[in-house]
């Protein structure tokens, strides 16, 4: 890929906390305008990677380039070109949806904050609830507002760190639809999740993080080719991402144990 087609480039990324190694030479690329899912169990280092890429945490060694800017050398430029939404919605429940958005637009010194807010409310299907306090919103609505707030200023790249944590099925589907729309409009989406069906539904490319390393990085279609379909009552049943994940992680565990 050409440099302007790559939103994120990571090579040999390492990070330790005291005597605990979290990342052991992680490397991957994310194509501009795509949805990239980083998949892994709790505690595997997904959030650590997000914190490094968003300049919230310094890595020990390796390189990380986001939107053409090295995260260590040009952190301010990185921050100006990205948005980050954490695992829990960071909204002010006392304010209305519109007031939350206007507040962020003013903090970012944008022209016509009210128009910015109205445009985002419409884009995220929140116009009818614009003047209600956020405390009355459903989980899915809060998450949509949270992501809308992170996009004030038209970021080229958004990091969604486990965006559907704590949401009911309806709320998760709301967020999935919105993520697809973001990518469709040209925004690059970096998604971390422990929900296999989420990655299966959304991602153009899936990387599996296990014990501090990326053990596989490919499209879902290519991952499925690693495992032949099973025949169930004369019908071919394609493997699910859950089956692929468990098989790959299981094989890696066997290999690691064999080397001990």
Regions found by a protein language model. Give the residues of each.
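ABC-family P-loop ATPase nucleotide-binding domain
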Residues: 1-14, 251-260
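ABC transporter nucleotide-binding domains
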Residues: 5-8, 15-191, 196-197, 201-210, ...
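Short, polar/charged, Gly/Pro-enriched helix-capping and turn/loop motifs at alpha-helix termini
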Residues: 92, 189, 230, 255-259
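Conserved NTP-handling cores and scaffolds of large molecular machines
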Residues: 108, 227, 231, 252-253
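Conserved beta-strand-loop-alpha-helix hinge in the C-terminal portion
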Residues: 213-237, 241
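Residue-level signature of catalytic and energy-coupling elements of molecular machines
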Residues: 245
């Amino acid at each position: 890929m050409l440099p302007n087609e790559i939103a994120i480039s990571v090579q040999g990324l390492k990070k330790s906390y005291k005597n605990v190694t979290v990342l052991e030479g992680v490397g991957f690329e994310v194509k501009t305008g795509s949805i990239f899912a980083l998949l892994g169990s709790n505690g595997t280092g997904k959030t650590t990677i997000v914190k490094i890429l968003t300049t919230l945490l310094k890595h020990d060694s390796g390189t990380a380039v986001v939107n053409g800017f090295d995260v260590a050398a040009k952190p301010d430029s990185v921050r100006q070109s990205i948005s980050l939404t954490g695992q829990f919605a960071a909204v002010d429940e006392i304010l209305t949806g519109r007031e939350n958005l206007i507040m962020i637009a003013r903090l970012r010194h944008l022209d016509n904050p009210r128009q910015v807010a109205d445009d985002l409310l419409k884009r995220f299907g929140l116009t009818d609830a614009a003047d209600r306090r956020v405390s009355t919103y459903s989980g899915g609505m809060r998450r949509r507002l949270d992501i809308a707030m992170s996009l004030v200023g038209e970021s080229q790249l958004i990091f969604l760190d486990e965006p559907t944590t704590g949401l009911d099925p309806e709320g998760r589907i709301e967020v999935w639809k919105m993520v697809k729309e973001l990518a469709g409009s040209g925004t690059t989406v970096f998604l971390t999740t422990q929900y296999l069906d989420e990655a299966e539904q959304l991602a153009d490319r899936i990387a599996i993080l296990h014990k501090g390393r990326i053990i596989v990085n490919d499209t879902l279609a290519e991952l499925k080719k690693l495992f032949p379909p099973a025949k169930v009552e004369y019908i071919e049943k394609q493997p699910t991402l859950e089956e692929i994940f468990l098989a790959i992680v299981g094989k890696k565990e066997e290999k690691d144990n064999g080397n001990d």
